[in-house]
A protein has these predicted regions:
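Active-site neighborhood of HAD-like aspartate-dependent phosphohydrolases
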Residues: 2-44, 182
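Metal-dependent phosphoesterase signature
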Residues: 52-98
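Substrate-recognition element of Asp-dependent hydrolases with the DxDx(T/V) motif
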Residues: 78-126
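Asp-based, Mg2+/Mn2+-dependent phosphohydrolase catalytic module
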Residues: 1-11, 118-205
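Alpha-helical substrate-recognition element adjacent to the catalytic core
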Residues: 29-66
Length: 205
């Protein structure tokens, strides 16, 4: 028996709709005499990342923790300045993905943003001109649980007002894709804009 075609799309933010230029962080690290890759390494350490993704601490508090971790190496003032400069860059929208989102919405498909994010997400969406480009925002820090948890995807489907079996989820991380499938969603591991042809075929429009 063939699976029903999806009538709603849930798309990841970082790595799909938003992309980051790694040269920005590398430039900050060089400027402030930091070890290459240390900004991301500290920020993404699970002990700091998990609380901010579930809304237990704010984005600002998270960045204070990153600066505190850098302080022994470069001093408090330079650590704070480095983090501030790094954080001033908020990424870039992938124009091909945005065009796809607009296309499917115009065809009547509901589109949600499904992201592990902080309380800075709304400001980022506004700064990138995305506030009106999506029907639903499913932010882990608001939901209180993050991908790949089944509860996250249940909340996303409720927000989309669509049963899991009719939602197509797109993410660049294998764990998130696997979690979505466990929750009953169709899911595709994003590798780049070449995937858009498949996604168009998978959606009912």
């Amino acid at each position: 028996m063939s699976r029903e075609r999806a009538t709603a799309l849930l798309v990841d933010f970082d790595g799909v709709l938003r992309r980051w230029d790694p040269a920005v962080a590398a430039g900050v690290e060089r400027e402030y005499g930091l070890t290459e890759g240390v900004l991301g390494e500290i920020a993404m350490s699970w002990g700091l990342l998990q609380p901010v993704l579930t809304g237990q601490v704010s984005h600002a508090q998270w960045m204070v923790s990153v600066a505190d971790a850098l302080t022994p190496a470069v001093g408090a003032d330079r650590a704070r300045a480095a983090v501030q400069e790094w954080q001033s860059y908020r990424g870039e929208v992938d124009p091909e993905v945005l065009a796809f989102v607009r296309e499917v919405r115009a065809a009547g498909v509901r589109v949600g943003l499904g992201t592990n994010a902080t309380d800075l997400l709304d400001a980022d969406l506004a700064a990138l001109g995305l506030t009106e480009e999506l029907d639903v925002i499913v932010n882990s820090s608001v939901v209180g649980v993050h991908k790949p948890a089944k509860e996250y995807f249940q909340a996303a489907c409720e927000a989309l007002e669509t049963p899991p079996g009719r939602v197509l989820f797109v993410d660049d991380e294998d764990r998130a894709v696997a979690g979505a499938r466990v929750a009953g969603l169709s899911a595709h591991r994003w590798s780049g804009p070449a995937d858009l042809r498949y996604l168009r075929a998978a959606l009912a429009y």
